[in-house]
Amino acid sequence: MKRNILARRAASAALAACMMFSLSAPALAASTDALLQQSTAAKNAVSVLDEKNCTLKIGNNSFDTATNIVERELGGGTISYDAETHTLTLNGVKIEDFSQDWVIDFNDKDTPLNLVLMGENLLKGKGGIRAHDLKISGTGSLQITATNYEGIASFGQSGGNLTIGSDVDITAMNGCAIAVSGSVRIENDATVKAKCLYGGIDCYDLTIDSATEVNLESTGEGCNAIYVRGDNDGTVAGTANIKNSKLVLKSDYPAFYAKDGIEISGGNVEAASTSDVGIFTRGELSITDAGIDASGYYYGIGSNGAMKMTGGKLKAVGQNNGVYIRNSLTLNNVEVDAECENWVAISSMGPMVLNGGKIEAVSKNASGDEANAIYAGDRYDGDELLAEGSLTIKGNAKVHVSGCQGIGSDGQTTIGEADIEIASTDFSIVYPVQIENGNKILSLMGGKDKESATVLNPDDFVWDRPDPNCIGKNAYLHIITGSVAGPDETPDPDAGYDASSAAGGAIAAVAVGGAAIWGGYEIATRVILHSVLPEGAAIPANRGQLALLVWNTAGRPEPAGAPAFADVADPDMAKAAQWCTEQGTMDAKGDCFEPEGWTPKFKVIEVWNKAFPKQ
């Protein structure tokens, strides 16, 4: 049954992927190539020159590139050119000229042009700047409006280079903002903004390093904000490397597409596609300590190669999937918010590892296809199994999912140290499931929903075969696991609870032997709680009671901000909840504190020791 569902889902996903692969990359490449050919044909009238007499054209003025231009008034400002360093300086010029195809045209393919900006400069014409190897720098800014062609372009089939280290704003009404048959680099705190019909940046490979902001919007059908394609013979890989920069990308097709791989380190990337994918690569996707907000019609973020993300935040929203990786997926200490309408919010074809972090995954199951919130499927090449889908959750990961079905995999699901809450409508976990060696269940509750959930026997949790009475039948399931202590370790009431400590391990050790030993867990935690809580204080049964007890014991301090939780009506509890979240002793989801939320005793110990660490 599961295999049939997965087969249908895989077929639908493959169809969507084929649509994307057959349209977004090739179709855009075709449209871009056609555009470049169209532009090239129009430009031939001015670019077929004697190579020995290279020219620099600025508006309707033509200059020999071997001759200096002493400071000269032009367009309300001044220009100058140093023939030895090939440096053109614009100082406050405003040039509007439609007599040529390019406002600035540097036709020397073998010589780089250094463009230095001073003051505010404006160029308006059929096309903006054409130069095969161009570096833009200086303390000034440049605004380009191109009515027919690109804002900035190279010529030829390869070897082009563009480096931008100053503020540039481009409007390309009927072309790409930037089209370079080679490498593009944006650096030095530059701000680059563009609104264009076709691609925002179309190049072979891309580096954005320490840019203040790169804001690109493509308005044309079937176009990308960033399109990194590599060269035709494969000598230059189509890779994008983003470091410590802010990107805001909007387009019809994938807002951020790089053929052979994407690497993002630091900064923030916001990518939105109206009919395809927010961020996509056919290669590997590597993200470190960055904030990602990706949304698309098919899915928010995806790759054909493996995806690995360490640190940072990931928001991924799509019609079919939030995160869709056709390979292995590893998330290390990432704060994830993934949502989809139809299928799986977080999906991989191959091993998936969720190590630490906070993960929220919501599948609305609009497809009616018994969708999971998180699922690791097998990866095939025809009938050949390339990689088994397995799911591992560990590293004290906090996972909250909702959907028709909760979490699972085609292979083995393994749970290490984790806090997993599943609010599904059908089945919470797909078999087979195991607890990772060295870990045990600390708390287990389940039922048809959260309100009716009851304490369950941990011995009933692990199963390795289909069983209608297995614990996964509970649509709601909340499991908390932790490490096991050594045989000689015992709880220390003065030490309090720490999931990684001997005391925490000891609590875990007595919590795993069925109902009788579960009673041992109850005794152990009560002993610890009565030793650390104020004398005569009742053990809190929910989050609201715990927040009030912590706040009252701390002396009822005023929170820094006004209480703003929508689900807390009592004024004192509202202040307590606000103060506890501000101090980091308790967490909350958005504007909801969930004051009635069940709190296990070991969690009370953990929060108490955060609020009042032992001196």
Can you describe what each PLM-predicted range is?
Residues 13-22:
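Bacterial N-terminal signal peptides
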Residues 17, 113, 134, 544, ...:
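Residue-level detector of short, conserved catalytic/binding motifs and their immediate flanks
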Residues 193, 364, 400, 550-553, ...:
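Short alpha-helical scaffold segments that flank and stabilize functional sites
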Residues 2-7, 21-40, 486-575, 582-605, ...:
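Feature responds to low-complexity, polar/acidic, surface-exposed segments characteristic
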Residues 1-2, 313:
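Helix-centric, low-specificity signal for extended rod-like, repetitive segments
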Residues 30-488:
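A composition-driven surface/loop motif
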